[in-house]
Amino acid sequence: MLILNVNHMNITQGMGVAELIEEMGRSGVLGAGRVHRATKLLRGMIDDLEMAIFMSVAGPLVPGGMRRIIRDLIDDGTISALITSGANLTHDLLEAFGGAHYRDYGFDDEKLHQEGIGRIGDVYTRSEDFEVFESENQEIFSSIFSAKPHISIQELIHEIGGHLDDDMSIIRTAHLRGVPIYAPGLIDSMLGLQLWMYTQDNRICLDAVKDMHSLSDLVFSHERIGAIILGGGLPKHYTLASTLLRGGVDAAVQITMDRSETGSLSGAPLEEAKSWAKAQAGSNLVTVVGDATALFPVILAGALSEL
C-alpha cells in the first residue's frame, strides 16, 4: 500500500485563491483535502463540453449573499438547469422589485416582529418590501394566467422572468438565457402563498408533473450530467432523481452541513446515491461538510482561476 505524507500548508502574504487551494491539496486530508478535490472536480465539470451541469440550491443562499454567484453561473452558460426552493426564488424577486436584505448583530425576535422585520439567521427583511412583493406578483400572475391558465411550475417561473427588469435577477437572467428553473416545492414559500391567494378569485392549473417531461428531455439530450448540490432537501433529491433512468449523475460536488447517521437525504453522502442508480458506478463524487456560503465561493473561485 502506498502511503502519502500529509504536507503542512504554507500560507503566505499576498497569495491568491488558486495558491491557497493548492496548499489545501498538499495537505490532502480532512476538510482541506475535500475542498481541493471539489475544486478540481468542478473545474473538470466546467471544462467538459459534453456535460450538462445541474445546480441544486437549498437553504437561504440568496438572502445569504449568493444571488450574484448563481445569476452569473446562469449568465455565462456554466449551468444548464437550476433546481431550487421557492424561498430562494422569493428572495430573488424581493430584490428584483426593489427590496433588499439587511445585516446586523444581536436581535430580539419579538421586537423585530413589532417593527415589521423578519429574521433568517443574521439576515433581515422588511415587511414593506414584502408588501411590494405581494402587489407586484399579483399583477404578474394576472398577466400570465389570463393567457395561460394551465402551466407548469418551470414555465411559470420562465414567464415571471419576462416581467422583470432587474439585470441581477436570477429569474430574469434564466429567462433571457433559456435556462430552466425547477422549484418542485414552490408552494412552500411566500411565492407559493401568493399563488394560493391568487386562486381565491381565479381558477388555474399549476402542473408539477409537466416539469418532468422537460427535465427528462434535458437529461437525455446530454452525454454526461454533473451536479452542484448546495444544501440538501427536496432540490437535492429532485436533481439526483431526474437522472435515475440514465443510471445517475456522472459527477457531483455536494456542500452540506447535515449528518448521515439519521438516514437523512440532506446529510447522505453522494456515494449512497449509487445504490439507487442516482449516481453512476465509477462516478466522481466529492462531499464537503460546511457552510455553502463560505465554501462554495472559495471552491468556485479556485476552479475559475485555473480555467
Curated annotation (Swiss-Prot):
Enzyme Commission code: 2.5.1.46
Pfam families: DS
Reaction(s) catalysed by this chain's protein: [eIF5A protein]-L-lysine + spermidine = [eIF5A protein]-deoxyhypusine + propane-1,3-diamine
Catalytic residues (positions): K278
Keywords, sorted A to Z: Hypusine biosynthesis, NAD, Transferase
A molecular function (GO) term: deoxyhypusine synthase activity
Cofactor: NAD(+)
Pathway where this protein functions: Protein modification; eIF5A hypusination
Catalytic EC class: transferase
A Gene Ontology cellular-component term: cytoplasm
Disulfide partners: none
Functional note: Catalyzes the NAD-dependent oxidative cleavage of spermidine and the subsequent transfer of the butylamine moiety of spermidine to the epsilon-amino group of a specific lysine residue of the eIF-5A precursor protein to form the intermediate deoxyhypusine residue.
Protein family membership: Belongs to the deoxyhypusine synthase family.
Name of this chain's protein: Probable deoxyhypusine synthase
